[in-house]
Regions:
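C-terminal accessory module of base-excision DNA glycosylases/AP lyases that mediates lesion recognition
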Residues: 1-31, 95, 118, 133-205
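Alpha-helical scaffolds flanking conserved acidic
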Residues: 8, 38-42, 78-79, 121-122, ...
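Short N-terminal amphipathic alpha-helix/helix-capping patch enriched in small hydrophobics
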Residues: 10, 17, 39-44, 60
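Alpha-helical ds-nucleic-acid-binding substructure associated with the helix-hairpin-helix region
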Residues: 20, 24, 52-53, 57-129, ...
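Hydrophobic (often cysteine-bearing) scaffold residues that line and stabilize catalytic clefts
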Residues: 36, 40, 44, 53-57, ...
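Amphipathic alpha-helical segments that form the core helices of the histone-fold
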Residues: 43-45, 84, 180
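Buried hydrophobic packing segments
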Residues: 44, 97-100, 161
Length: 205
């Protein structure tokens, strides 16, 4: 399981280099990120949440829980595609999470993830159907606790940066990268606090 032993040091680092983030950290002192180590769970939950609102994703997830008595790859593996679709998933998403569950069933995801570098995690996960850079970023943050992830594919993060740094004006990804550069090597922590500014209740993938 990932850990966040770096968290307090990270807060000091980003706060000393960015007065805007310093104020945000003070406004949202708790909770901090708590990586859970379950890569497969994050893959599945992230696929469910792709390109829909947090509220819609939560509703779909709750229907999946009700259908299967809990959401895990074993239960998904035993559930047919049309039943998954009945939870509110598109056909494509239902196929994606079924494929992930099948990989889990045959042991293809039985990996010592904590021993891998960030680049190695990306190399292993990106070839999976339905898994893109954003989904891998969620795994790196919420499952494995990597400290310097900047999920530029996350609409919420981009909106939070624009709200706090440009008065809501649209920014290019290059501009966001520039704003985020002083946060290195703790961009995960900065991302976590910026997310709080648009949703005080933490999302957990």
């Amino acid at each position: 399981m990932g850990n966040t032993d770096y968290w307090n040091e990270a807060i000091g680092h980003i706060s000393s280099r960015d007065p805007i983030l310093s104020r945000i950290v003070e406004a949202y002192p708790e909770p901090k990120l708590s990586p859970h180590g379950d890569v497969v769970r994050t893959l599945i939950k992230s696929v469910v949440g792709q390109q829909i609102s947090v509220q819609a994703a939560d509703a779909t997830w709750e229907r999946m829980v009700a259908l299967m008595g809990g959401v895990d790859p074993g239960r998904i593996y035993e559930t047919d595609i049309m039943s998954l679709r009945g939870c509110g998933l598109s056909m494509r998403k239902a196929e994606y999470i079924s494929g992930i569950a099948e990989m889990w069933e045959r042991g293809a995801l039985n990996v010592n993830w904590d021993e891998l570098e960030e680049s190695e995690v990306r190399e292993r996960l990106l070839p999976i159907r339905g898994v893109g850079p954003w989904t891998v970023d969620m795994v790196l943050i919420f499952s494995l606790g990597f400290q310097d992830v900047l999920p530029l594919g996350d609409v919420g993060l981009l909106r939070a940066v624009e709200n706090n740094y440009s008065g809501g004006k649209k920014l290019t990804l290059e501009e966001v990268r520039g704003i985020a550069d002083p946060w290195r090597p703790y961009r995960t922590v900065a991302t976590w606090y910026l997310w709080r500014t648009i949703d005080a209740e933490p999302v957990n993938y």
